[in-house]
C-alpha cells in the first residue's frame, strides 16, 4: 500500500495550504482539513478536501496550538492510523509537538521529501546543519510531519469540488498559555515563497541604513527583499520572516541576488534551488561564488546604486 487511508492537514498560514493539499492528494485516499473559519474551509474543499473540520470557540487570548487536544481526539475517532501534514512555521512546529505527544506519533520536522511504503511514511530532510540529507521511516501508526516550503507544488482550486463540513468545539487544555497582548508587525508581510525575483542581503551590506540600497533595487526590478539569518537574528535589521536558510525559508525563485552574503551551507540550502544565483561580495574567496552563476567582486554599497540605475533604464 503506497498511500495512507487518511491524511489530516492544517496550516496556520493560508498561503501554505495549497501546497500541503497537493501533498495530501499524493499521499492519501481521503483528505481531512482542519480550518479556522468558513473561508478557509471553502478553499480547502476546492483544493481537494473530502472533509473539513472547522475549529470553533477558541477564546481570543488562547493560542492556536491549544486546539491540539480536540484535533488529536478527532483524528483518533476516525482511524487507528494516519498522516498529519503541517507547515514548518513556528506555530506549525509547536502544534506538531503537541499532536505527536497526544497521538503517540513520531514527529519529523522540515520534511523535503515524503513518500509512503507499506502504509508507513518515509521522510527525507536536511541534517547536520544542511551538510547531508537524512532519511527516516516512521513506524508509529500516526505520523506528524512539518513540511518545508517548496516540497510540493501548490494544488489548483476547483470550484466544482464538494465536501462535508463538520465543527470541532474548543476544549480548554489542562495547561495553556494565555496571550496578554499583541503587537502589529512594523512592516507588511510578504509571501517570499511565491516571489520570482529575490534580492537578499547579508551583513556585508554594512548597516541597517544601507538596506535601503537593496530596497531601491527591488523597486527597480520588481523583486522581493530577503536576508540571511544573521541580519534577522543577530543584527535585528530585518524581520525573522524574511531570512533564508535551512531553519526558515527555502526558496526557488527565477533569480536570487545575494548581496553581502558569505554563502555558508546553512544559508545556501534555502537558496540553492534558485534557477539563477547572482552574488555581490567584496571577498573574492567567499563561498557564495561556488554557488553563483554570475558574480561581482566589490563593495555592495558602491555596486548597488550603479546596478539599480542600469536596470531601471
Swiss-Prot record:
GO terms, molecular function: electron transfer activity; flavin adenine dinucleotide binding
Functional pathway: Amine and polyamine metabolism; carnitine metabolism
Family annotation (Gene3D superfamilies): HUPs, TPP-binding domain
PROSITE patterns on file: ETF_ALPHA
KW Electron transport (keyword) present: yes
Positions contributing to FAD binding: 255-283
SS bond partners: none
Keywords: Electron transport, FAD, Flavoprotein, Transport
A Pfam family the protein falls into: ETF
UniProt-listed GO biological process terms: carnitine metabolic process; fatty acid beta-oxidation using acyl-CoA dehydrogenase
Domain of life according to the entry: Bacteria
Record bears the keyword Electron transport: yes
Protein family (similarity comment): Belongs to the ETF alpha-subunit/FixB family.
Record's function text: Required for anaerobic carnitine reduction. May bring reductant to CaiA.
Quaternary data: Heterodimer of FixA and FixB.
NCBIfam families from the UniProt entry: PRK03363.1 (NF002889)
Name of this protein: Protein FixB
Higher taxonomy: Bacteria, Pseudomonadati, Pseudomonadota, Gammaproteobacteria, Enterobacterales
Amino acid at each position: 500500500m503506497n498511500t495512507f487511508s487518511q491524511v489530516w492537514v492544517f496550516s496556520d498560514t493560508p498561503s501554505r495550504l495549497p501546497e500541503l493539499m497537493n501533498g495530501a492528494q499524493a499521499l492519501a485516499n481521503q483528505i481531512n482539513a482542519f480550518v479556522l473559519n468558513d473561508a478557509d474551509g471553502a478553499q480547502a474543499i476546492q483544493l481537494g478536501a473530502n472533509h473539513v473540520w472547522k475549529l470553533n470557540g477558541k477564546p481570543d487570548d488562547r493560542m492556536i496550538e491549544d486546539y491540539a487536544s480536540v484535533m488529536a481526539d478527532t483524528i483518533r475517532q476516525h482511524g487507528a492510523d494516519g498522516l498529519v501534514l503541517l507547515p514548518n512555521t513556528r506555530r506549525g512546529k509547536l502544534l506538531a509537538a503537541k499532536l505527536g505527544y497526544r497521538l503517540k506519533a513520531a514527529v519529523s520536522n522540515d520534511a523535503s521529501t515524503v513518500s509512503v511504503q507499506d502504509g508507513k511514511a518515509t521522510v527525507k530532510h536536511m541534517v547536520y546543519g544542511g551538510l547531508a540529507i537524512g532519511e527516516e521511516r516512521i513506524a508509529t501508526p500516526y505520523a506528524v510531519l512539518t513540511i518545508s516550503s517548496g516540497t510540493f507544488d501548490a494544488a489548483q482550486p476547483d470550484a466544482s469540488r464538494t465536501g462535508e463540513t463538520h465543527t470541532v468545539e474548543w476544549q480548554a487544555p489542562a495547561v495553556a498559555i494565555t496571550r496578554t497582548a499583541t503587537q502589529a508587525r512594523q512592516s507588511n508581510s510578504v509571501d517570499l515563497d511565491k516571489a520570482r525575483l529575490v534580492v537578499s542581503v547579508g551583513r556585508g551590506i554594512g548597516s541597517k541604513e544601507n538596506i535601503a540600497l537593496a530596497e531601491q533595487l527591488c523597486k527597480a526590478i520588481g523583486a522581493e527583499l530577503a536576508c540571511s539569518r544573521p541580519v534577522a537574528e543577530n543584527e535585528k535589521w530585518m524581520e525573522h520572516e524574511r531570512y533564508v536558510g535551512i531553519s526558515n525559508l527555502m526558496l526557488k525563485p527565477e533569480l536570487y541576488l545575494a548581496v553581502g552574503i558569505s554563502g555558508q551551507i546553512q544559508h545556501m540550502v534555502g537558496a540553492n534551488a534558485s534557477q539563477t544565483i547572482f552574488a555581490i561580495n567584496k571577498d573574492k574567496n567567499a563561498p557564495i561564488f561556488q554557488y553563483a552563476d554570475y558574480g561581482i567582486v566589490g563593495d555592495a554599497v558602491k555596486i548597488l546604486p550603479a546596478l539599480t540605475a542600469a536596470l531601471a533604464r
